[in-house]
Amino acid sequence: MLRLESLSCGYGPVRAVHDLSFEVEKGALFALLGPNGAGKTSTIMAIMGHVDVQAGRIFFESEEMTGRPAMDRVKEGIAVVPEGRLLFTDLSVDENLIVGGYALPRSEYAENRERVFSLFPRLAERHKQIAGSLSGGEQQMLAIGRALMSKPKFLLVDELSLGLMPKMVDLCFEALLTLKRNGLTILLVEQNTARALDIADEVCILASGRLVYRGSSGEAKEKQGLFETYLGVVCEASASSS
């Protein structure tokens, strides 16, 4: 569904990602892992058209996206939940959802909003509340909901669990699994390696902007040395399966 071919991208003369190739199949939950500064967020921003592609190509549903405006990617069905959520904190929950659905006819707003509220009932209870007054977990729910308002086929999620309490992490990961079961294709960037491996079908690991591993999550769990070398962690999921 999404394919990167020898992608290199960066910021002016600085190259953040080097010669990266991978493909995300329709309906999959694909995890992109790596230490801070590995190029994960730059990859997501290149897919969305917010970072310069210096070499290589990006395809979505066999259509080349390289060089096309960010709005085109939204219209084609790609949405992003950015790191740090980036909500309009002075607007209400409802108003943030309206912003998320700006590319669709207003007539579809109510149906899309109910779909979001079904996934996150807590947002329905707080739909008139100012986004900046929500808890961190509720704000992450709203960030996901805002992305879903455009009825995407493909969802990019950058650092789902960052700064969240364990209970909220559980709720947000369960929401991703629900979306996957409903047919949404997901690319997840996540620092919580064990949780990412538990839900992902396939995993890529980046280090210094380069691909160092690609395989199924099951295979990755068997490679403890991989996580110690590139992520500096002992992965509980790996340890428990050995």
Residue spans for each PLM region:
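Conserved ABC ATPase signature
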Residues: 130-134, 138
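The feature captures the beta-strand-to-loop junction immediately N-terminal to the Walker
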Residues: 33-35
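ABC ATPase C-loop
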Residues: 147-148
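ABC ATPase NBD coupling module
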Residues: 52, 64-85, 89, 109-113, ...
